[in-house]
Amino acid sequence: RFIISEIEVAVKLKADLPAGSDLAAAEAAIESIHPVIEMIGNPFVDRAAQSKDLLLGDLQSNGAIVVGPAVDNGIRAELATLPVSLSYDGAVAHSVEKGANWEDILKALSWLSTHAEGRGLGLKAGHVIITGARALLARGDAKEIEGQLGAWGKVNCTITG
């Protein structure tokens, strides 16, 4: 069961990003920027009994990623103060106006290039990399989920089960 929705900014790679890549190489490897919904699932019988570290979304409770259409690269200049909203069933449930700026995202990609390669999971052309939750909230029984990245673009999905 999907229990939390997170609205994120993601990048899609057009080229492999080898270990040790600097910021310029990271930027050159990016094909496009996308709005994304990360759906956090609950793999635990008793979620409340788990440690906070174990409840982190990435690689532990990630249930699905929904990737929206690419947005214009002009979004890069606004990322630090970008209004981002998460809507459930047509009503805004959470919104923020802050997040990682473009340089922060490039630094994270540079770091991730080495970290991923060290784990045998190099960053390859075509990979979509999420860059951290901006707006997030427990889903409850909501069926329609939408994420809005200011005036730049949106992503949505419908829960059917």
Residue ranges and their predicted role:
Residues 105-140:
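A conserved acidic, glycine/proline-rich C-terminal tail/linker
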